[in-house]
Curated annotation (Swiss-Prot):
Protein's recorded name: Alanine--tRNA ligase
UniProt subcellular location: Cytoplasm
Primary subcellular site in the record, as a coarse category: cytoplasm
Entry cofactors: Zn(2+)
Recorded catalytic activity of this chain's protein: tRNA(Ala) + L-alanine + ATP = L-alanyl-tRNA(Ala) + AMP + diphosphate
Cofactor detail note: Binds 1 zinc ion per subunit.
Organism, as annotated: Methylococcus capsulatus (strain ATCC 33009 / NCIMB 11132 / Bath)
Gene3D superfamilies reported in the protein's UniProt record: 2.40.30.130, 3.10.310.40, 3.30.54.20, 6.10.250.550, Bira Bifunctional Protein, Domain 2 (3.30.930.10), Threonyl-trna Synthetase, Chain A, domain 2 (3.30.980.10)
EC number: 6.1.1.7
Domain comment, as recorded: Consists of three domains; the N-terminal catalytic domain, the editing domain and the C-terminal C-Ala domain. The editing domain removes incorrectly charged amino acids, while the C-Ala domain, along with tRNA(Ala), serves as a bridge to cooperatively bring together the editing and aminoacylation centers thus stimulating deacylation of misacylated tRNAs.
Enzyme class, UniProt record, top EC level: ligase
Residues that bind Zn(2+): H554, H558, C656, H660
């Protein structure tokens, strides 16, 4: 029975028994900061179990995609070395939300295994929590399980909890017995860690609420949460003991072997690659991109581990992305979203492999040398840190290589080096925060700014220097808290409103509006005239021109977000934003620079929607209803049961609490002014709207006019004239390079005659004026060819800066490394450098000491050669 057939039979079995089949949720948990990835079938139902969410069904079944890599649940280091560890797996599960309980859950499980899958009862072993007499009775008396294949477990292994407090309850586990030919004993015995008995299904009975003091109170509506690994079940049904021998993995392993040009399918590296393509492809499908933090860094670690195992198999060209096709063939029918995302997944994996390939070979050489020169079975933390910091090796990749050599990594030393780097970064940042402005007031403020920009209200608190006062005098800076306010407090990337607060005797200029907590709105500014009193009646007036400009930019940001997803793909999600009266800035997830053509299309889409002039509407509704509408939510934001949904026609739907235009046409015009990268996997677009956009277009027009005048060309011939100029420039550059090469050839012959012989190695250290770094490299390459066995350092000085290039012929790199050679000179002239063993570069800023440093090279080489 294939894995696909097993999945289908499981879901049909429970659908026939009144369960709603629910699609797998994303690997990125929605609004759950406690989890890095979805790691169990119950994750998408967590709020249902906790009573925070209600679904239109009380029975559910699912085949849930799961990842266990990074965080508390981390199987990464074991993948490839064991029969059953994976970074990605599918969990089959059936769930009851206050409907059926132990009896039905147990009977369903037994029926599915013994009647649908026809597993022999004598091959199954049951465990229950020792105190769960009800489950014990059902198994032994109603189901009729053999008491000789039944164990009571007294430990927490058979008692599940969601956390230190909350729902919890006993478990009942079902094991498959591979038979006496396999080592290992039944669960609950000292030999239980063997491979004979494999857990295939866990039935969790949520029947208690655990309080902070540990006491257990029965739940009014007990529930059921079960989980069964598809891969383990497939291994049982296909009569293999290793998950990597099931149909799904066999085909992926074969595909990886073809790329590696090997017929030995038992190599653990092939299994690693077959496992990792599943987790990586589905993570990218669900919007995760490689980066240096959080989920993105876990993805990067998995990708790089797979690439390293490809390198170990002898693969030197990008290969990992080529496995997305075979994966789609295996899993695309069950998960069509993978097939839909295939081009994007292949592109992301290919880009990441190209990026890592640049440093993989160098890093592996350094690691090989470190292992070869070890005097102990431990790779130093400093070496692991150098590989991480310089060559992009995640430390678990280094540990993986160490494990293959029977070695360990000094993790404590690695962490010390990491902490030292963090300290250097903190020391260099010089940021300071004034925490004295944290304000504690037992008051609330009602926001009325959606309806109007002016509000008659009352002052409920005044603060000066963070302290509550009854009065502010003219010229004093302070904070005003109002009973009601039309001022929007900075939130969701939109800056706070500015304006004035007027009383009969005072004018307070609001420079910024901030929120503290959920309902305290702080108006920060300066009292321009009069005296402001706590309790006074006043009028709050928002500066409407600034608000309108900000609102237009905010609505344009929503249009931009929607356009990005249409042009670049559904993986685009907001990573940050800034919306103020002058401009908008939008950070989003994407794996490469946005091309000029894509930027044009994005801008065209936004301006099309502006011309369509759709109404901008806001509606408060239940969060579930908003999600069903397809509203975009910001990951990491916490939303209540009711949310504000902002829609711009049928083009954009997002959860947003900000101030917006009334119609899309109010924006007028949208113009992108820049696109850049701000972090790995995060891009930034800055844009302007309205009058600022018109000014940007006019500025471009003025620039084009000036260029045309200087080129003595019309608008229609300007591009042609520029092409002619560039071609002429390229011809001149080629002629210059030819002359330089001719000069370098003559200089090379002269320099070669100045080399000295030290123990059979030609050594040359010379200054070559009027040469740039490129010419120095070409000269070094020429001299290596001319001199045979050689060690060379050439230097040039320009503008008080020294450039150095060192070269060593390959037959001598075992004795002399170019990086060490160039640094022997660079350190004496206030610089440093590095490079490959045969070629390295450096710089310095003390040209007056250069000649002395060059004169010392022959003696330095003599020491290296022990001559």
């Amino acid at each position: 029975m294939t894995s696909a057939e097993l999945r289908a039979r499981f879901l049909k079995f429970f659908a026939d028994r009144g369960h709603t089949v629910v699609a797998s949720s994303s690997l990125v948990p929605v609004n759950d900061p406690t989890l890095l990835f979805t790691n169990a079938g119950m994750v998408q139902f967590k709020d249902v179990f906790l009573g925070r969410e209600h679904r239109p069904y009380v029975r559910a079944a699912s085949a849930q995609r799961c990842v266990r890599a990074g965080g508390k649940h981390n199987d990464l280091e074991n993948v490839g070395y064991t029969a059953r560890h994976h970074t990605f797996f599918e969990m089959l599960g059936n769930f009851s939300f206050g409907d059926y309980f132990k009896r039905e859950a147990i009977v369903y499980a037994w029926e599915f295994l013994t009647e649908v899958l026809m597993l022999p009862p004598e091959r199954l072993w049951i465990t229950v929590y020792a105190e769960d007499k009800e489950a014990e009775r059902i198994w032994l008396e109603e189901v009729g399980v053999d008491p000789g294949r039944f164990t009571r477990i007294a430990t927490s292994d058979n008692f599940w909890s969601m956390g230190d407090t909350g729902p919890c309850g006993p478990c009942s586990e079902i094991f498959y017995d591979h038979g006496p030919s396999v080592a290992g004993g039944p669960p609950g015995t000292p030999e239980e860690d063997g491979d004979r008995y494999v857990e295939i299904w866990n039935l969790v009975f949520m029947q208690y609420e655990r309080a902070g003091d540990g006491t257990l109170t029965p739940l009014p509506k007990p529930s059921v949460d079960t989980g069964m690994g598809l891969e383990r079940l497939a291994a049982v049904m296909q009569r293999v003991r290793n998950n990597y021998d099931i149909d799904l993995f066999r085909n992926l392993v074969k595909a990886a072997a073809e790329l590696a040009g090997t017929t030995d399918l038992a190599q653990s590296s092939l299994r690693v690659i077959a496992d990792h393509i599943r987790s990586c492809a589905f993570l990218v499908t669900d919007g995760v991109l490689p980066s240096n933090e959080g989920r993105g860094y876990v993805l990067r670690r998995i990708i790089r581990r797979a690439i390293r195992h490809g390198y170990k198999l002898g693969i030197r060209e990008p290969f990992f992305y080529k496995l997305v096709g075979p994966l789609c063939a295996e899993m695309g029918q069950a998960y069509p979203e993978l097939v839909e995302a295939r081009p994007r997944v292949e592109q992301v994996l290919d880009k990441e492999e190209e990026r890592f390939a640049e440093t993989l070979e160098q890093g592996m050489k350094i690691l090989d040398v470190a292992i070869r020169d070890l005097g102990s079975p431990v790779i130093s933390g400093d070496t692991a840190f150098q590989l991480y910091d310089t060559y992009g090796f995640p430390v678990d990749l280094t540990a993986d290589v160490a494990r293959e050599h029977g070695l360990q990594v000094d993790m404590a030393g690695f962490e010390r080096a990491m902490e030292a780097q963090r300290e250097r970064a903190r020391a260099a940042s010089h940021f300071s925060v004034d925490y004295s402005q944290e304000i504690h007031l037992d008051v609330a403020c009602e926001f009325t700014g959606y309806r109007n920009a002016v509000e008659d209200t009352r002052i409920v608190a005044l603060l000066r220097d963070g302290q509550a006062v009854d009065r502010l005098e003219a010229g004093e800076d302070g904070v005003v808290v109002l009973e009601k306010t039309p001022f929007y407090a900075e939130s969701g990337g939109q800056v706070g409103d500015r304006g004035v607060i007027r009383s009969d005797s005072a004018v307070f200029e609001v420079a910024d509006t901030r929120k503290q907590g959920s309902d305290l709105i702080l108006h920060r500014g300066k009292l321009r005239e009069g005296a402001l009193l706590r309790g006074a009646v006043c009028r709050a007036e928002v500066e409407q021109s600034l608000r309108l400009a900000t609102a237009l930019n905010h609505s344009a940001t929503h249009l931009l977000h929607a356009a990005l997803r249409r042009v670049l793909g559904e993986h685009v999600t907001q990573k940050g934003s800034l919306v103020d009266p002058e401009r908008l800035r939008f950070d989003f997830s994407h794996f490469e620079p946005v091309s000029p053509e894509q930027l044009d299309e994005i801008e065209r889409l936004v301006n099309r929607e502006i011309r369509r002039n759709a109404e901008v509407t806001a509606e408060v509704m239940a969060k579930d209803a908003a999600m069903r509408l397809g509203a975009m939510a910001l990951f990491g934001e916490k939303y209540g049961d009711d949310v504000r949904v902002l829609r711009i026609g049928d083009f954009s739907t997002e959860l947003c609490g900000g101030i917006h235009a009334r119609r899309a046409g109010d924006i007028g015009l949208f113009k992108i002014v820049s696109e850049s990268g701000v972090a790995a996997g995060v891009r930034r677009i800055e844009a302007v709207t309205g009058a600022a956009a018109v000014e940007a277009v006019e500025a471009t027009e003025r620039l084009l006019r000036r260029l045309a005048e200087r080129m003595k060309a019309g608008r229609d011939t300007l591009e042609e004239r520029l092409d002619q100029m560039f071609e002429k420039n390229r011809a001149l550059e080629r002629e210059l390079e030819r002359l330089k090469a001719k000069t370098a050839g003559a200089a090379g012959a002269d320099l070669a005659s100045r080399a000295v012989d030290i123990a059979g190695v030609k050594v040359l250290a010379a200054r070559v004026d009027e040469a740039d770094a490129r010419m120095l490299r070409e000269l070094v390459d020429q001299l290596k060819d001319r001199l045979g066995s050689a060690a060379i350092v050439l230097a040039a000085v320009e503008g008080g800066k020294v450039s150095l290039v060192a070269g060593v012929t390959r037959d001598q790199t075992g004795h002399i490394r170019a990086g060490d050679l160039v640094n022997s000179v660079a350190t004496r002239i206030g610089g440093k450098g590095g490079g490959r063993p045969d070629l390295a570069q450096a710089g310095g800023n003390r040209p007056e000491e250069l000649q002395g440093a060059l004169d010392g090279v022959p003696e330095w080489v003599r020491r290296m050669l022990n001559a």
